[in-house]
C-alpha cells in the first residue's frame, strides 16, 4: 500500500510537471493580470487595491484578471461579488489553472511569494508589493539558515518592481535584510502603500464603514468606539496554530471584561495563519473580523489600535489615531526574533499585561496620549507614512501599467561599484573543500568584492552548521525547488550525463533554453562579474554557472582530477561518471584553477584533451589561522567529550605531547585515496621496534571497519586509536608528537598546514603535488610506500625530524593574491 501511494504521488507530480512545462511553452498573454495574496488566503492587501483600481479604470477595460485562492468557499463573498464579471475569474492555488495563469499571464502581482517552480518568463512583468513595513527582523537579519529565506529572495530577484511604503523598507528590508543591494536588477517604487489608500475616507464613508463592520460582526455598534486588537503570529509551528488561538481567546476575553463595553467594542483581527482556526471558536463570535475583508477598511474606522509586533501599526500611523501595544512576552520574543526598534521608540504606550493595557486605554480615553508618546507618534508618522495620501495605488498603476516614471520615486537598489562574485560552495558537508571555502570567505576583501555563495538546499544539521560558519559578509543563496521543462527534455539531459558529454547545454537549443530558464529561476535578474565553481565535482552546478550572463567563469580543481575520477571506493569508481561529465565542460570555463603550482602542471598535462592549456591557473587554499590556534589551545580531554553522553573517551588520557610514549597522528576521511592501510602497515613495523609508540587516526569514512580489522590482524589494535569524526581535530593534533600523511594523491592537503600551525613535525609521502603542499624544508618527504613511511617515522623517533616555524599570515596574504589573479580580478591574471 505504501509503495502504491508513493507511485501515485510520483505520477501526480510528473503530470503536474508536464502541465507546467506545456503552459510555459505557450505564448504569454499581455492582457491578463494574475494576483496572489498571502499564498491564496484572499483578495487582500496591496494586490486587491491594484486589482480594483485597474478594474474600475476604462483605460484598462481590455485586461482580464485572475486571482489565486486557496479556498473559494472561505472567500465566497468576493467570489459572489464578481460572479457575473467576465473579466474576473478565480483559480485554486496549486491547480492546473493556477500554473496556467502563472505561466501565461503578462502581469504578475503578489504580496508574498510564488512557489519554487515559478520562474518569470520573457514578456512577463512581476510586481511584488510585499505586505508591510517590518518591526520584527526579517530575512538574513534573523540568524536562521539560508533555506528559510531562500524563496523570498528568489522571488525578489525575479521581480521587475518591488513596492516600498517608505525609505526604511528600501534600505532595511530590501537592501540589508534580504541583501538585494548590488544584485537586484529591477526597480523599487517608493510611492506609498496601495492598501493604505482605503484609510483615507470622508465622514459619510466612515459612517458607512462602521455600519459594515457592525453588520459583518452581527453586533449593535451605535456610538461605541472601536478598539481593534491585531496581534502578529508568534507561533513556531504553523501546523499547530491552535496554540496561539487559546492565548488569543484568553486575552480578548480578559480585555472585554476590563473595558466599558457600553462605550467600546473590541474587534479581533487575527493573523492569516490562524484565522480559519480561530473562526471556529464560539468565544470569538461577534469579535473576529473576517479574513476575506480588507484590514485597511477596518483600520479606517478604528478608533484605537492595539497590537504587539505586527506591521499593522505602520499602516495605522497614517490615521493619526492612538496606538497601544500589548507585549507580555517581549523579553523572550525580542531575543528570539529580534526587533528593529526598541519599545521606547514605539508610537504608543507599551503594556506588559491585559490589566495594564486596560488602564492604558482608560488613560487614553480620559487624558489622551502623553506628550512623549505624541512626539514619537508624529516622528514615526513622518518617517514611515509620509507618502500616504490616498493616491498610492494610482501612482503605482501609472508606473507599472502605464510605464510613466516621470515625477515618481522609482529607484535602483544601492550599488557601490564592487566586483560581484558568485561562488558555488559545494554541498557544505564537513570536508576539506568546505573548510577551504570557509577560509577563503574569511580572507576576501569585502571592500573590493560583493560576494554571493550558492549551495543546494539542505536541512541536515551538520550541513546547516557548516553554512553557519560562512562569513556573514557573504550573501547566502540556497537553491530551492527543481528545474522546469518537460520530461523529454530532462531525459535528454540525463542521457548526456550518462554519455559523459554535457556540451549539449550549449549545442542543443532545447537544452540551452532549459539551463537558461534554470538560471533565471534561481537568480532572476541578478548579474555577476565572476562565477566560480569552487567544488568542481558536480556537473549540475558546473553547467548552471555556465549560463550566467556576461560573466567570467572559473572552476576549481582540488585534486589530481583524473586520478580522482578513477578512484575506487568499495569496488566502484564513484566519481567517474560525474567527473567525466565535468571534464567535458572544461572548454567552456575561462579559468581552471588548481590548488597548487605542481598540481596545476599535473592537471594541465592529464586534462589536455578536455581543456585549453592556456586556461590553467593555480591558487593555494587559505589557512584558518585563528580557528586552528584556538582549537589547538583546548585541552584534549575537553575537546573530545561526546556531546550525547557528556563522557570523555578513555583514549584521551593517552594523548600527552612530549611524554615517553610518542604519538603519531593523521587526520582525514577514511577512504581509498588516503591509504591508511599503508600507514597501518608501516606503523606496525615501527611499533615492533619501538613499543612506546601509538598512532591516532582522526576521521570517519567507509573504510573504518576494514582498517580496524587490519590493525587487529597486524597486532597493533592496542596501539592504534580510531577517534571517528571530531569537531576539533586540532586539539588532538596539538596533543600528539608527529603528523604523518600516507595519501596516494592530494590537491593541497590543508591538514599539513594545520600541523605546521600547531607546531608538529611532519612526515609525508611524495604524492604528486607534495612540492607545493608545505613550504620547502618544513616536512620530511619520503617514498610513497611502506618502507618510506617506516624510514620517516624512525627518523622522527631518532630526533632527525623537527617542527619548523610557519608564518601563516604571510602565507595567507600570498594565497589570497593568487586567488585574485586566478579569477582575473587583478592585473596579470595568468599565474601559471
PLM regions with names:
Residues 83-85, 274-291, 473-481, 708-724:
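Nucleotide-activated donor-binding/catalytic signature segment of Leloir-type glycosyltransferases, i.e.
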Residues 349-354, 776-787, 794-800:
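Conserved acidic donor-binding segment of nucleotide-sugar-dependent glycosyltransferases
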Residues 161-185, 564, 587-618, 623-638:
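A short, active-site helix/loop in glycosyltransferases that binds the activated sugar's phosphate group
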Residues 99, 147-162, 518-525, 561, ...:
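Membrane-proximal helix-turn-helix segments that form the acceptor-binding/catalytic region
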Residues 725, 744:
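Aromatic "clamp/platform" in nucleotide-sugar-dependent glycosyltransferases that forms part
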Residues 372-396, 801-830:
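A charged, aromatic-enriched C-terminal amphipathic alpha-helix characteristic of glycosyltransferases
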Residues 305-306, 322-333, 761-764:
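Short hydrophobic beta-strand element within catalytic cores of glycosyltransferases
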Residues 45-51, 194-278, 629-660, 671-699:
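Conserved catalytic-core segment of nucleotide-activated headgroup transferases in glycan assembly
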Amino acid at each position: 500500500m505504501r509503495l502504491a501511494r508513493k507511485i501515485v504521488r510520483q505520477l501526480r507530480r510528473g503530470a503536474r510537471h508536464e502541465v507546467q512545462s506545456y503552459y510555459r511553452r505557450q505564448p504569454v498573454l499581455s492582457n491578463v493580470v494574475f494576483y496572489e495574496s498571502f499564498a491564496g488566503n484572499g483578495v487582500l492587501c496591496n494586490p486587491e487595491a491594484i486589482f480594483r483600481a485597474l478594474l474600475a479604470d476604462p483605460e484598462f477595460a481590455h485586461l482580464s484578471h485572475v486571482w489565486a485562492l486557496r479556498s473559494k468557499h472561505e472567500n465566497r463573498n468576493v467570489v459572489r461579488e464578481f460572479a457575473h464579471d467576465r473579466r474576473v475569474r478565480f483559480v485554486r492555488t496549486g491547480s492546473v489553472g493556477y500554473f496556467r495563469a502563472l505561466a501565461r499571464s503578462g502581469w504578475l502581482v503578489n504580496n508574498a511569494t510564488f512557489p519554487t517552480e515559478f520562474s518569470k518568463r520573457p514578456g512577463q512583468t512581476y510586481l511584488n508589493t510585499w505586505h508591510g513595513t517590518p518591526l520584527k527582523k526579517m530575512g538574513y537579519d534573523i540568524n536562521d539558515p539560508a533555506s528559510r529565506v531562500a524563496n523570498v529572495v528568489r522571488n525578489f530577484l525575479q521581480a521587475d518592481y518591488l513596492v516600498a511604503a517608505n525609505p526604511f523598507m528600501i534600505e532595511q528590508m530590501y537592501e540589508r535584510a534580504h541583501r538585494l543591494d548590488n544584485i537586484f536588477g529591477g526597480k523599487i517604487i517608493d510611492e506609498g502603500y496601495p492598501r493604505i489608500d482605503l484609510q483615507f475616507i470622508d465622514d459619510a464613508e466612515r459612517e458607512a464603514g462602521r455600519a459594515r463592520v457592525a453588520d459583518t460582526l452581527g453586533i449593535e455598534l451605535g456610538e461605541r468606539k472601536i478598539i481593534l486588537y491585531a496581534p502578529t503570529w508568534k507561533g513556531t509551528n504553523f501546523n499547530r496554530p491552535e496554540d496561539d488561538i487559546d492565548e488569543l481567546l484568553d486575552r480578548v476575553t480578559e480585555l472585554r471584561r476590563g473595558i466599558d463595553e457600553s462605550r467600546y467594542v473590541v474587534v479581533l483581527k487575527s493573523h492569516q495563519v490562524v484565522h480559519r482556526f480561530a473562526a471556529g471558536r464560539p468565544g470569538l463570535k461577534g469579535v473576529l473580523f473576517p479574513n476575506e475583508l480588507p484590514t485597511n477598511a477596518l483600520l479606517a474606522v478604528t478608533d484605537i489600535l492595539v497590537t504587539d509586533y505586527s506591521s499593522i501599526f505602520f499602516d495605522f500611523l497614517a490615521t493619526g489615531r492612538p496606538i497601544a501595544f500589548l507585549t507580555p512576552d517581549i523579553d523572550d520574543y525580542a531575543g528570539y526574533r529580534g526587533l528593529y526598534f526598541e519599545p521606547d521608540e514605539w508610537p504608543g504606550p507599551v503594556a506588559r499585561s491585559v490589566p495594564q493595557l486596560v488602564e492604558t486605554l482608560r488613560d487614553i480615553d480620559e487624558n489622551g496620549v502623553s506628550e512623549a508618546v505624541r512626539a514619537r507618534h508624529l516622528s514615526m508618522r513622518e518617517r514611515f507614512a509620509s507618502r500616504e495620501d490616498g493616491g498610492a495605488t494610482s501612482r503605482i498603476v501609472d508606473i507599472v501599467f502605464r510605464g510613466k516614471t516621470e515625477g515618481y520615486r522609482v529607484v535602483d537598489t544601492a550599488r557601490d561599484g564592487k566586483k560581484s562574485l558568485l561562488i558555488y560552495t559545494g554541498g557544505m558537508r564537513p570536508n576539506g573543500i568546505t573548510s577551504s571555502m570557509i577560509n577563503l570567505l574569511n580572507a576576501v576583501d569585502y571592500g573590493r568584492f560583493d560576494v554571493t555563495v550558492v549551495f543546494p538546499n539542505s536541512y541536515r544539521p551538520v550541513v546547516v552548521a557548516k553554512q553557519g560558519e560562512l562569513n556573514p559578509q557573504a550573501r547566502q543563496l540556497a537553491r530551492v525547488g527543481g528545474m522546469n521543462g518537460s520530461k523529454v527534455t530532462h531525459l535528454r539531459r540525463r542521457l548526456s550525463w550518462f554519455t559523459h558529454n554535457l556540451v549539449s547545454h550549449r549545442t542543443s537549443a532545447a537544452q540551452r533554453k532549459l539551463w537558461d530558464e534554470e538560471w533565471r529561476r534561481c537568480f532572476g535578474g541578478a548579474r555577476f562579474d565572476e562565477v566560480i565553481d569552487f567544488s568542481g565535482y558536480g556537473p549540475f552546478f558546473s553547467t548552471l554557472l555556465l549560463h550566467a550572463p556576461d560573466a567570467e567563469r572559473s572552476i576549481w580543481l582540488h585534486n589530481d582530477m583524473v586520478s580522482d575520477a578513477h578512484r575506487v571506493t568499495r569496488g566502484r569508481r564513484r566519481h567517474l561518471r560525474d567527473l567525466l561529465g565535468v571534464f567535458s565542460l572544461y572548454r567552456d570555463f575561462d579559468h581552471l584553477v588548481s590548488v597548487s603550482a605542481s598540481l596545476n602542471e599535473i592537471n594541465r598535462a592529464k586534462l589536455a584533451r578536455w581543456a585549453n592549456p592556456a586556461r590553467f591557473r593555480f591558487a593555494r587554499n587559505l589557512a584558518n589561522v585563528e580557528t586552528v590556534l584556538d582549537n589547538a589551545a583546548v585541552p584534549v580531554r575537553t575537546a573530545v567529550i561526546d556531546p550525547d553522553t557528556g563522557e570523555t573517551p578513555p583514549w584521551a588520557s593517552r594523548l600527552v605531547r612530549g611524554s615517553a610514549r610518542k604519538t603519531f597522528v593523521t587526520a582525514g576521511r577514511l577512504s581509498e585515496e588516503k591509504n591508511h592501510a599503508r600507514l597501518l602497515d608501516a606503523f606496525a613495523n615501527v611499533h615492533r621496534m619501538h613499543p612506546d609508540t601509538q598512532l591516532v587516526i582522526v576521521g570517519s569514512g567507509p573504510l573504518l571497519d576494514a582498517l580496524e580489522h587490519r590493525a587487529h590482524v597486524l597486532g597493533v589494535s592496542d596501539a592504534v586509536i580510531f577517534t571517528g569524526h571530531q569537531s576539533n581535530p586540532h586539539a588532538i593534533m596539538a596533543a600528539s608528537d608527529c603528523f604523518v600523511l600516507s595519501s596516494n594523491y592530494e590537491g593541497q592537503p590543508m591538514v599539513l598546514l594545520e600541523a605546521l600551525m600547531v607546531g608538529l613535525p611532519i612526515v609525508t609521502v611524495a604524492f604528486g603535488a607534495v612540492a607545493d603542499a608545505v613550504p620547502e624544508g618544513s616536512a620530511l618527504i619520503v617514498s610513497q610506500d611502506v618502507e618510506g613511511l617506516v624510514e620517516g617515522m624512525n627518523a622522527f623517533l631518532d630526533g632527525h625530524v623537527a617542527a619548523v616555524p610557519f608564518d601563516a599570515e604571510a602565507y595567507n596574504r600570498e594565497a589570497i593574491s593568487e586567488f585574485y589573479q586566478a579569477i582575473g580580478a587583478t592585473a596579470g591574471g595568468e599565474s601559471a
